[in-house]
């Protein structure tokens, strides 16, 4: 579960490395956000690259929206089958719910693909 002030890894090539959660937007429960939920984040650390377009560049301190891709808590599927990840990861999205980066790094759970 992701709560406020949780530090998360960014799993796309938008330029951000670490982000911190500042608000839970579309949470499936009152306890915290899980896989597939939308949160508001602030960029804590980024990579400066010279070949990134200015529209796709993410700066430190910038507030963005993100969708949760993986959590350490995991996802329960039918038959008591749990899927867990080794880190909490997000992908940055814009106001039209399109990803800022052009690639997603690492596995993406099936629950995200069916809900979106």
From Swiss-Prot:
It is found in: Mitochondrion. Pfam families: Ribosomal_L14 (PF00238). One of its GO terms (cellular component) is mitochondrion. It comes from the Eukaryota. InterPro entries: Ribosomal_uL14, Ribosomal_uL14_sf. Coiled coil: none annotated. GO terms for biological process: translation. PANTHER family: 50S/60S RIBOSOMAL PROTEIN L14/L23 (PTHR11761), LARGE RIBOSOMAL SUBUNIT PROTEIN UL14M (PTHR11761:SF3). This is Large ribosomal subunit protein uL14m. It comes from Acanthamoeba polyphaga (Amoeba).
